[in-house]
Amino acid sequence: MYNATNSRSRMFRYEVVGLRQTAETEKTNYAIRNSGSQFFNVPYDRMNQFMQQITRWGGKIVSIQPLNGTVAPLAATTEPAANNGAAPVKEKKVDIPVNIYRPNNPCIGKVISNEELVREGGEGTVKHIIFDISGTELRYLEGQSIGIIPAGTDANGKPHKLRLYSIASTRHGDFQDDKTVSLCVRRLEYKDKETGETIYGVCSSYLNQLQPGDEVKITGPVGKEMLLSDDPEATIIMLATGTGIAPFRAFLWRMFKENNPDYQFKGLAWLFFGVAYTANILYKDELEAIQAQYPDHFRLTYAISREQKTPDGGKMYIQGRIAEHADEIWQLLQKKNTHVYMCGLRGMEPGIDEAMTAAAAKNGADWQEFLKGTLKKEGRWHVETY
């Protein structure tokens, strides 16, 4: 399991400054000095808790070093900084990288880890895969995708076609050292209508079976539709089903797990996440840790179709949750810096349109006119469904 198997045995050395002895620190086994850097060895599956603890103690994390690895600088995870009444600070515009690597000239990434995200009792298998891209020119932004070219050939002896996957890490990578890119990949499987045979997706199966050290051909990045708004005071509404969570994990890490000098999020992020079972909530611990640490800036709403019911007794899909909150969402959409991002199954779209049509009508508006003439025209409605 992600954060529970291979990663659990990995240790990281934290360098922390600014700690002070308090009643709380005296209850721990840590020897707290009143000045200088202090170092802590922390297992991977306790990193979130440890960073929250350091924040409570008033400290600042200045680097993380994988034991037997290299130093990866990391700022402290603290409450989003107040703006002290100043005008909103806009993130410096960056060039959007596109097709740095093409299918005829891919770069080579090396697998660092490949870990299961679905917990016991869940459906299917989904892996969080981290690739080492150091030594390449690959760079990317939150909301983009990369292409993967599976090894081997198809039935006709030709190379397999590439498949695109949404990136699940920020531009700085999971270790925040600008040397990795991460994916969230579900192994595709379906029944052949004629034979009943189970068919597995070529690329998703290839990725799910990779081992640390394996080399993979990577292309891209591609995509401009899902780029995260650079307004640190924006309202960001995210609608995800299944592995559609990938770009939103990147968004949330950028908002809450990194302390970028040019982007300190002070707005509202609201994630609606639809899954079949609780065991299928991908990155559950991460999401709930962020919610606990930033309750004023992050809202988390699950739609668990096999476990939750709508008021009329039906299964609770994500569109049902949108219907419950449609009036509030409508009001949020009147703000010029509210963006909606949708990623996952296309089947959620009609129900969301229906819910928002009803909410708009209560306010004397036509949802389709508002959607096309305002949200899409202003670049505030972002959709990547399949």
Swiss-Prot record:
One of its GO terms (molecular function) is ferredoxin-NADP+ reductase activity. The keyword Electron transport does not apply. Residues 9-67 form the CpcD-like domain. The lineage of its organism: Bacteria, Bacillati, Cyanobacteriota, Cyanophyceae, Acaryochloridales. Keywords: Antenna complex, FAD, Flavoprotein, Membrane, NADP, Oxidoreductase, Phycobilisome, Thylakoid. This is Ferredoxin--NADP reductase. NADP(+) binds at residues 166, 186, 243, 275-276, 305-306, 315-319, 344-345, 384. GO terms for cellular component: phycobilisome; plasma membrane-derived thylakoid membrane. Belongs to the ferredoxin--NADP reductase type 1 family. The gene is petH. It is found in: Cellular thylakoid membrane.
